[in-house]
Swiss-Prot record:
The gene is tam. PANTHER family: TRANS-ACONITATE 2-METHYLTRANSFERASE (PTHR43861:SF1), TRANS-ACONITATE 2-METHYLTRANSFERASE-RELATED (PTHR43861). It catalyses: trans-aconitate + S-adenosyl-L-methionine = (E)-3-(methoxycarbonyl)pent-2-enedioate + S-adenosyl-L-homocysteine. This is Trans-aconitate 2-methyltransferase. Its main location: cytoplasm. GO terms for molecular function: trans-aconitate 2-methyltransferase activity. It comes from Streptomyces avermitilis (strain ATCC 31267 / DSM 46492 / JCM 5070 / NBRC 14893 / NCIMB 12804 / NRRL 8165 / MA-4680).
Length: 269
């Protein structure tokens, strides 16, 4: 049976908003000058909109559209919609990254920690680069931590005797993201000048079971959705103990290494 489409909890996701926003800021810092002013920008997989507003700070006159397929996330993002301080505009709309194709030329299409949820997303790159204006940019960031303890322990538990009948097909792994080299090859094959890199952040998290608290907002969502409240509580209890051993708390906090892969592709003018 196919896994349920994950449900999203914006409040849970935003509990680590500062840490989650850092990679997006680093991604935007590598985006070159855009070809038009005012620019037209799409944020594909905008979530609750808290980082989409950073785009308006970088390009204050831009017409920005945040796109997401989660009604819960879009409802939260609506608080940021409207005219921006620099004379631009920020709007949000429903769209699915699995099928979205630009209907008009964009100066920048950006995506932050979304494409890992899109099976076959590397095959979507041609449609997105085709949707760029001459001189435009496609920029995205994906988590590269699927072999880290936080994900490995989740998968091992999902495939254990107690849970495998319900969760064996719920979590993706090998095909969720590609290597930096694969993204570089795909983007340069499309005729783009590509800047691809990876970084491992060492997040120092505070509070009780902070790694569990983090993944409840993202990677654990398919499990929580598939199981429902009662069984999810039992799964989380087992998972919590494994995470405590893998990520021991110290007097300064809990260190959570998080690898991420970045790509910025510039289309020829």
């Amino acid at each position: 049976m196919p896994a349920a489409v994950p449900s999203w909890d914006p409040s849970q996701y935003l509990r680590h908003a500062d840490h989650r926003a850092r990679p997006f800021a680093d991604l935007l810092a590598r985006v070159p000058e855009l070809p038009r002013d005012p620019a037209r920008i799409a944020d594909l997989g905008c979530g609750p909109g808290n980082v989409t507003r950073l785009i308006a700070e970088r390009w204050p006159t831009a017409r920005i559209t945040g796109l997401d397929n989660s009604p819960e996330m879009l409802a939260k993002a609506a608080a940021y919609a409207g005219p921006t301080a620099g004379g631009g505009r920020l709007d949000f709309a429903a769209a699915d990254a699995r099928t979205w194709t630009p209907a008009q030329p964009y100066d920048l299409i950006v995506s932050n920690a979304t494409l890992q949820w899109v099976p076959g997303h590397i095959d979507r790159l041609p449609a997105w680069t085709d949707g760029l204006a001459p001189g435009g940019t496609l920029a995205f960031q994906v988590p590269g931590n699927f072999d880290s303890p936080s994900h490995r322990l989740m998968r091992e538990l999902a495939h254990s005797a107690r849970w495998k009948d319900r969760l064996a097909d719920t979590l993706r792994h090998d095909d969720a993201v590609h290597t930096p080299a694969a993204y570089l090859e795909a983007l340069t094959a499309l005729g783009c000048a590509a800047d691809v890199w990876e970084t491992t952040y060492l997040h120092l998290l505070q509070g009780e079971d902070p790694v569990l608290d983090w993944v409840k907002g993202t990677g654990l969502r398919p499990v929580l959705t598939e199981l429902g409240a009662a069984d999810a509580e039992a799964f989380v209890a087992e998972y919590r103990e494994a995470l405590r051993e893998a990520y021991p708390a110290t007097e300064r906090g809990t260190v959570f290494p998080f690898r991420r892969v970045f790509a910025v592709a510039h289309k020829e003018a």
